[in-house]
């Protein structure tokens, strides 16, 4: 097959991005929504191809859980049965570690249930027929107007029409914008972006609608427009008033799993540094048994953590520090007071911090990541510095996607 022709190919594997991979004389091509062993007709465009016809289906193929699958770009792998899908996702972590020469125990993938994603960031656009609200088509800016989503919590999906009403008041002409909905204990927290400057009339109308529809809050580009109820989420026993757009783990059940792994490894550590702590996802749970120093560059997240701590008794001391750990990682001397360190950086990882941590005498480390490649890089740095990687646990909190969370626990010296 030439680089711009149609033809028949056989899928050999699933790539790291969730697409089927076929090996051709002039290189690999990637075909979404296919499975290993399948024979397919495709239309090729350089190293990518569109599935035109499924000629021989894999026995591992199943009916997708959503009517929008293959149109909506949110999911890549609903068509794959659970067992091979989970083995493949675990292998993403195993492969990344092996790529750095790390041979360590990788636990079976911890599965997460459908209907548990607590935040959805919808693409939206106003049309003559109303507001389109959903997700972008695979590798496109076209918005697929959804009526269901088996990934997202029902509390959000049940409010799609209400969200469209909010979108109609936000809409900047016919241009696209984003409307995120997060499930909190106080109700849905809405955060809009890309809508341009809101005028006074829009603000009044939005305020009335948010109150009428019983949403907890609406913000625009980080500015709170109306907040009938303070959006709260508990981390352990601490209720935290989460700021607009703050980082949260994708699902509450995955967060509980990660927290349990963190706490089990820390054991009786007296003092813990929680780096890239966010709003206190782990720090506030750790504080039930250990003194915690929570470090984060997001001022709003730190302020929310601090407000949560001030309203709960019985915690060990919690100190906070605003710091850009990419530019100013904690140095070995600064790490001397701590028995343990937890770090959960963005997808880019924590290379600079890992380099300093590797030189430290900290006895226990927990590394959490949504990117196996940067996690493996950081673990290799720590391993070179004398840390022993005890175990890595992959967690499927990004269901039917090519993304996977992982928690690694490490030790150094006598335990």
From Swiss-Prot:
The protein's superkingdom reads Bacteria
Gene3D superfamilies linked: 2.40.50.1070, Nucleic acid-binding proteins, Vaccinia Virus protein VP39
Q: Which major enzyme category is it?
A: transferase
One Pfam family recorded for the sequence: tRNA_U5-meth_tr
Q: Could you say which EC number(s) this protein's record lists?
A: 2.1.1.-
Residues at the catalytic site: 370 (nucleophile)
Q: What does the record give under GO molecular function? A: 4 iron, 4 sulfur cluster binding; metal ion binding; rRNA (uridine-C5-)-methyltransferase activity
GO BP annotations listed: rRNA base methylation
Which controlled-vocabulary keywords does the entry list?
4Fe-4S, Iron, Iron-sulfur, Metal-binding, Methyltransferase, S-adenosyl-L-methionine, Transferase
Q: What family does this chain come from, according to its entry?
A: Belongs to the class I-like SAM-binding methyltransferase superfamily. RNA M5U methyltransferase family.
The name on file for this protein is Uncharacterized RNA methyltransferase BR0438/BS1330_I0439
Provenance organism = Brucella suis biovar 1 (strain 1330)
């Amino acid at each position: 097959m030439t680089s711009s022709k149609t033809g028949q190919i056989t899928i050999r594997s699933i790539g790291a991005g969730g697409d089927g991979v076929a090996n051709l004389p002039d290189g690999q091509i990637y075909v979404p929504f296919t499975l290993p062993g399948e024979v397919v007709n495709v239309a090729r465009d350089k190293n990518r191809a569109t599935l035109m016809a499924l000629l021989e289906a894999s026995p591992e193929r199943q009916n997708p859980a959503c009517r929008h699958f293959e149109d909506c770009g949110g999911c890549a792998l609903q068509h794959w049965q659970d067992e091979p899908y989970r083995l493949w996702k675990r292998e993403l972590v195993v492969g990344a570690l092996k790529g750095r020469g790390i041979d360590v125990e990788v636990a079976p993938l911890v599965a997460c249930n459908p209907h548990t994603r607590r935040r959805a960031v919808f693409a939206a656009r106003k049309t003559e027929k109303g507001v389109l609200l959903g997700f972008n088509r695979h590798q496109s800016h076209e918005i697929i107007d959804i009526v269901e989503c088996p990934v997202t919590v029902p509390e959000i999906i049940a409010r799609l029409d209400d969200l469209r009403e909010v979108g109609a008041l936000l809409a900047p002409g016919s241009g696209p914008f984003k409307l995120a909905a997060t499930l909190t204990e106080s109700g849905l927290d809405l955060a809009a972006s890309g809508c341009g400057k809101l005028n006074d009339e829009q603000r009044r109308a939005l305020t009335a609608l948010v109150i009428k529809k019983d949403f907890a809050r609406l913000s625009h580009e980080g500015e709170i427009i109306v907040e009938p109820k303070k959006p709260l989420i508990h981390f352990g026993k601490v209720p935290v008033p989460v700021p607009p757009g703050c980082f949260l783990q994708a699902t509450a059940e995955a967060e509980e799993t990660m927290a349990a792994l963190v706490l089990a490894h820390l054991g009786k550590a007296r003092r813990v540094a929680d780096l890239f702590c966010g709003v206190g996802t782990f720090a506030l749970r750790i504080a039930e048994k250990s003194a915690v120093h929570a470090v984060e560059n997001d001022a709003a997240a730190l302020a929310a953590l601090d407000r949560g701590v001030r309203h709960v008794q019985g915690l060990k001391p919690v100190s906070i520090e605003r710091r850009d750990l990419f530019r100013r990682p904690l140095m070995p001397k600064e790490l001397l007071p701590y028995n343990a360190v937890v770090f959960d950086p963005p997808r880019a990882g924590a290379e600079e911090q890992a380099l300093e941590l590797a030189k430290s005498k900290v006895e226990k480390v927990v590394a959490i990541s949504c990117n196996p490649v940067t996690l493996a890089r950081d673990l290799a740095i720590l391993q070179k510095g004398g840390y022993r990687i005890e175990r890595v646990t992959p967690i499927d909190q990004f269901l039917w996607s090519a993304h996977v969370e992982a928690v690694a626990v490490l030790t150094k010296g006598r335990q």
